[in-house]
Amino acid sequence: MLFRSSEIYSKKILYSVVGLVVIANVINIGADIAAVGAALNLLFPVPILLASTIFTLVVLFLEIAIGYHAYAKFLKFLALSLLAYVITAIIVHPNWGEVFRSLVVPQITWEANYWYVIVALLGTTISPYMFFWQATEEVEEQKYASKMGLPRRTLRTIRRDNTIGMTISQLGSVFMIITTAVVLNQNGLKEIGSAADAARALEPLVQGFPNAGTYAKILFAIGIIGMGLLGIPVLAGSVSYAISDTRTWRQGLDYKFSQAKQFYAVIILATAAGWLLNIIGVDPIHALIFAAVINGLVSIPLVFLIFKLSSDSRVMGVHTSGPLSKTMLLLTFVVTLACGAILGFSLLSA
């Protein structure tokens, strides 16, 4: 799609979009590596930087030597540990009336910190790298299906899968927010300063066990490590897909390293660049939030570009967006633009 759009629109637009995604993803990779390093530090008495370095090497080895698709289907089960937040939310009995009321009518303030978190929340929901990863993975799955003699996935099937996946993802995010807010506030913790602080949100789930705090840390660490093993290759891979599109290189995680050296070289460089950010001693929690804010800001021009591309029959053929899709895309663009602008003004006036 990028290559096709570059034939219609200015290549400056193409390179600008790719540049934004590369910057955002490298920052995200660095933040994710730092988060996993902190999670490993909860389990083993090793320095965070050493843990981050070992983890980075493991990720690259698995992605290149084993193949992402070969191990990702097993690692998905590690992500089930995030269900602990759903169960914990039920255990702690929050005031559900207040929760639902706050979801519908949030208490808005004009402080910079408030809008910083709002833009970060948008950045974790409208993840720019997924524009590249999702589209390319669908193409790769179609190729795999053709090789195996399986029926091709229809657009209706793809749309249904995306709807189900995004619904589950967002429900999981909501429960994580509810659980963390309720449990940490009950314990007088107003700010998360470390991975250990974040892990305390799961203590009610294991409070009947001896050393409940230790079990909470283990649960939290398993979830973070699993998501890191799944997410970092996606971030690095989407960088490589984006750059490969501009260079018309052979691309795809179904190829071996010897078959797509340039594609994998970009993955290695993007992952290494993210790891280098850890050398300067970034705080894992602050880095994750900052990376999400960058995602939120980068998503503004990308959403508008998707709106333009999806409405252009020269790019989409007969599959242009319908009225509902166009309306939702335009609304998303306006909301993200407004939140980004308010954040900018609030930071300047602070």
Regions found by a protein language model. Give the residues of each.
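Helix-loop-helix module between adjacent transmembrane segments
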Residues: 12-67, 123-127, 226-231
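Hydrophobic alpha-helical segments and their helix-loop junctions in multi-pass secondary transporters
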Residues: 80-107, 123-138, 305-314, 339-350
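C-terminal membrane-solvent junction of multi-pass transporters and transport-like membrane proteins
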Residues: 74-77, 245, 251-268, 284, ...
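Extracellular/periplasmic helix-exit of transmembrane alpha-helices
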Residues: 136, 140-143, 167-197
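Transmembrane alpha-helical segments of multi-pass small-molecule transport proteins
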Residues: 16-19, 43-65, 81-85, 89-90, ...
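Membrane-interface loop-to-helix entry segments
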Residues: 54-55, 63-93, 294-299, 321-325, ...
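Loop-to-transmembrane helix boundary motifs in multi-pass membrane proteins
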Residues: 11-12, 49-53, 164, 168, ...
